[in-house]
Each structure stands twice: as C-alpha cells, then as structure tokens.
C-alpha cells in the first residue's frame, strides 16, 4: 500500500506475489489510480538514506500492522565488515570505526572509550562523528589513543553494542630504505632502450619520489603527481637514447624523516659499422713494456706509503701503558693473540693481548675530563667481588670552591683471573657510564684512573649495599635467612619495611630506567642484585657491564659467547638473542616480583633448560605475597610475549607514581603473617637444590648463580639452576653481606 501524507510518499513493506493496482490518496481527497507496482522488500543503507527502514521520515510513525517487532529492534548493517575487532595502526594515521545500524527510529548511537563516554573534544585533535554518530574518526592517532572503543545503539525496543580495540604502533623514525638492485651502471649503444628501477623496501610514512639526472646541471626527469602510482615512479625508461642521455641518474625518495637516494651511470656508445672495424696487432715488445711500467709504478707507490706512515708515527708521542698486574702469579695463556681495535667514542687506539708475562698491556689515551690522580684516592676494605672483578670502598679527595673535600666512593677493578674479554667489558662499561651522564637513580661515574697502574672505575658509593640483600636482611624475623657464616653474627637490620617503601623503590628504579631509555641505552642485566641502596633509601641502578648503546638501531643482537642473566631475560632474548627496551621492561617485571617477594628467587623449581617451554605455555611467576592485584597486573603486562604489547618505562613511571601516591607510609609488612611461598628458603633442601649446589660447586659458582653462558646463536653451553636457597649457607669469607656493584661476569 502506498500513501501520500504531508508531501511524503509512504511505501508499506508488503510483498506481492503478482502485480497489483496501487492507489494514491491525499489527506483531503482521493487521487486516481496512476500505476501498477510490484513491491519488493528492500533495506536501505542507513549511511546514505535520510529515512528509516520503513520509508518514513524521522518525525513520522510507522503503522504497527506493517512491521514486526523484530524489525524495530536495532540491528547491524553489513555485520560481516565488523568482524575485525583488533586494529593495529601506526602512530599518525587516521582511524575510523563504523557501527551502521538500522531499526525503528529514533535510534541513538553512543560511543565509549574504555567504558567512559567519549566527548567530542576529549583528545588532542578531537573526535569526529559522521552519519548520525554511526562513524567515529580519530585523526593522527597517538599512543594514548590505545583503548577499547564500544558503540551502543538503542531505541525504545532494545539495544545492541559492538567493541573495537585499537593498538597504536610507534613509527620507526628512518628515511625511506631503497634497494639498489635495479640501479646498476649500464652501457648501451645509441638508439637502445634503458630502464632503471628504484624499489622502495620500507618507508613508514608515504614517500615522495623524484628522478634526477646529473650532468653539468641537475635536471628533474620525473616527479610524483596526484594521479601517479608507486609502480610508475619506481621505474624510469629512456627510449632511443642518444649521447645527450649519458650521465648519472639518481632516484630520490623522501618522507617526513629524511631523504635517501641511489644512483647509477649510463654510458652511451656509438653504433660501429662492422665494415669499419679494423684491428691492429700490438707488438709483443709493447706488452713487456706495459708490464714493466706497471710493476715500477706499484713499487714507487708502496715505498711512498711506507715513508708517509713512518713519518706520522715518529711525529706522535708514544702511548702510555697500563699494566694489569697478576698478583697471584697465575700462569698466562699459552696462545698469544694481538687484535687491533677501536673502542667506543674514545679518540685513541689500543692493542689488546695476553702476553707470556704476568700482565696485560693496553695502550690508551687519557680522557682529561674524567681522569683522576691515584694519590687522591685512598682504598679501604673490599666490599664485593666476583669471578673477574672486585669493588673497594674508598675516599676520594676533590677540590671544591678552593678547598679539598673527602667523598665516599667505590672503586671497581679487575682481578687476576681476568681475560681480554673482561677488560673489554670493563672499558665498555666505562664508555657507557661516560655517555649516559648523571641521574639521581643511577650509579654515577666520578672518574677513572687509566695511567700509571691498573684500570680503576671510581663511582658513587651506596652505603646499604644492593637491593636484593637489603630486602632479605630486613625481612620479618621468621622469614629471615641470615646472610652470615656460622661463626659470624647476623648483619644488623636497617628498619622495618613498609609497603610504601617497596613501592617507592619500584618507582625510583622505573625512573632510572626511563632515563636510560631516553639515552638509547639498554641495560640487559636489570635485577635487584644490580640496584644499590644509598642513604635516605635512594635507589641507584648499577652494573653497566652488559649495557649497550643502540643510538644507531633500536635493538642490539648478541653475536658472541658470554654469560647472561637467563631467568631475568625476556622470551625473545632467550631464543633470538635480541635485546630492546622491551626486554628491559620484562626484566623490570622480574625486579618488581623480587621486591614484593622480599628478595625471592624467580622461577623456583624450574630448570633453566625448561624455562623457554614454561614461558611459551603461558605460565608466569605467581603473585608475590606482598603485591596487590593491581601491581601484579602491572607485572603481567611486563611479561607479555609480544614486545609491542608491553608498557614503556614512561607509562610504568606514571602507573607507579599513582600507586605510590595512594599507598600509606604507615602500612608495615605484617610480621606475623604466615609465608609459605616457594621462593623463600627452606630448612630442608630438596634433591633439586642439592643437585644445583653440587653443579655450582663443580663449576666454581655458588648456588645463587644467575648467569647462563650463551653462544652467539642462543645455544646453552651449560646450565646452572637457581632452585636452591636464596644464598649459599657458607659463602666466601671475602664476600660481605652488603654486596656492591658487580662486574658483568660476576655472580
């Protein structure tokens, strides 16, 4: 039935099996029959139609006898296009979400971000709504736009909803990457056709491409326009070339980050008539003359190079030597290697070797900005040692304001059991600490001693030792596992621990790691044993022996053999030897677990060779006793298998700052609470613990070893499990309880 009311035509949704006569009538008088109409059911697209599904204007009502209730309830249009719920978009892109809906009018569509109603100006750049709120647009998305977006459509008959999830991926700030396969020098004859190809391998932002020719002047041959495609711009074809076409051709590609280019030469030869070709045999004597002339020129050039090298060497002052003494007179290695290498940003050259004498000599040029005099440093007792390094407490005499002052310091140096690699690691640590600079929550470098003696690194001194021992030392009495030998008294406890203190320690370490990430430095060995506790409960990140500079790339791939903290490493670091800021975030999650377990050992009972399978199965460390559910969720976020889904240190600082502000300074750890966690020590060792200690003793390591030797391809040379007690019940008498900064290979 078709009716005309208020100048609008209403078409009742009726199915006719055959043609029928349709009449029109006005509000005042009937009209004549005008046509024969075969009606069919048709649902219009609500994104383009200004009328509802029954053909009525929004202000009119529908006859209930012509539409069933199920057509009145809101329902989605093209629901198959809404199946993709997770959208990963690069930062800076425009994102659109659509919820096309139909049903009885009026229908209201509301949008929510993580459960909160979306306001039009609720983000930088605002939200844009189109098609009666059925489409939302986010221009130039940023990291804070990561969320779940839900559209809710409802009318008086019911409501439906649909949720999209947006993941914003940070862009890689590099210019376009070009392939030079198609840009090779070519030599052709006049009249030939030449093709140069310039393939863009990668460009985060859309690149702009131009083709240039360099001869006497630069000529723009081809430029991308509005209607050109990428395939057209990647190819330059020259037909019927002439001598004027010879020269250098360049493909220039640029984006908002920078410009890249590849070039090739075109040489054009004349067409030679075969009838004009003639050859003249070169006399045999001429061959001999050319050969002799070449040999003489080579000898003269070689003599000139030797003369210039000798002249430059004689004009330079001889480098000073640093003897690395061997006080224990351990026999040197029988094989001598003398590689020549350039170290870091130092303007110096060094020759590394293991000679047949009892010392190693390194040629190094002093850095006047950091060089200290040995007579200004007074060494005291040894406060920590490992396999290849040791740390002494010292007094540093410095001049400030015209008068001398004494500063507490820690001096790190190598032991007699060192190797060339240990020396290189110590030099790398020195170079990293110089480059990183100063921050409240990292151990700052005070200076170095590279001349007239063994190599010293002079750093700040933390009076309360490392964080792991501090937490264990201040556990409630019934959980205390004393850090002492049977003949020595237990170390004194500092002060009762509060949950706010644990939260403050976590927040400070996150701030220090945020600073290192801004400096493009990955730590690779973040753990409670490498965080020092200074006065006023100030946390300082230490041990840059494994730290690496990633200013040129956003990652570091380990290619050599060496020891790594296996149970603190991210999954991709274990399997692919790939280290990024995201792997440091994983290690920070383990550090949080250590803090709120009061110095517990991670993955108790899990063998290192089973750890990868354990993590790939989705298993993670259990919630520690003193961590809240919110904090444990933060740990689990740090242990996401995909590095892109882990939070950044900036976000971790914000979250921990909020948690710290809401925590109470009077909330002490419950001294009477029972604790039966697997990560705390037990009076009776399991068989697994015994095997771990036996293995450790056989290799010269204690049972609390955390490093695994890894080769360049991720294979394990051997295994040391950490399922044993927190500390060796009979530690070396030279190791005191307030352990300080450790070397890379120390345990």
Curated annotation (Swiss-Prot):
Where is this gene product found?
Answer: Membrane
Give residue spans, biased composition: Basic and acidic residues: 710-719
Which residues lie toward the Extracellular compartment? 25-288
| Alphabetized InterPro entries for the sequence | FGF_rcpt_fam, Ig-like_dom, Ig-like_dom_sf, Ig-like_fold, Ig_I-set, Ig_sub, Ig_sub2, Kinase-like_dom_sf
Q: Which CDD domains match?
A: IgI_2_FGFR, IgI_3_FGFR
Q: What Gene Ontology molecular-function terms does this entry list?
A: ATP binding; fibroblast growth factor binding; fibroblast growth factor receptor activity
Substrates-to-products reaction catalysed: L-tyrosyl-[protein] + ATP = O-phospho-L-tyrosyl-[protein] + ADP + H(+)
The cross-references to Pfam families, in alphabetical order and at most eight, read: I-set, PK_Tyr_Ser-Thr
Q: List the disulfide bonds.
A: 99-151, 198-251
Against SMART domains, the record matches this protein to: IG (SM00409), IGc2 (SM00408), TyrKc (SM00219)
Q: Which PROSITE patterns match?
A: IG_LIKE, PROTEIN_KINASE_DOM, PROTEIN_KINASE_TYR
Entry annotated with the keyword ATP-binding: yes
One of the GO biological process terms? positive regulation of MAPK cascade
Write down the glycosylated positions.
26, 42, 63, 161, 185, 217, 227, 240
Residues with PTM Phosphotyrosine: 556
What superkingdom heads the lineage? Eukaryota
Q: Which UniProt keywords apply?
A: ATP-binding, Disulfide bond, Glycoprotein, Immunoglobulin domain, Kinase, Membrane, Nucleotide-binding, Phosphoprotein, Receptor, Repeat, Signal, Transferase, Transmembrane, Transmembrane helix, Tyrosine-protein kinase
Task: Tell me the first and last residues of the signal peptide.
Answer: 1-24
Cytoplasmic side of the membrane: what ranges? 310-747
Q: Which family does it belong to?
A: Belongs to the protein kinase superfamily. Tyr protein kinase family. Fibroblast growth factor receptor subfamily.
What role is this protein assigned?
Answer: Receptor for basic fibroblast growth factor.
Question: Mind telling me what this protein is named?
Answer: Fibroblast growth factor receptor
Species in which this protein is naturally found: Ciona intestinalis
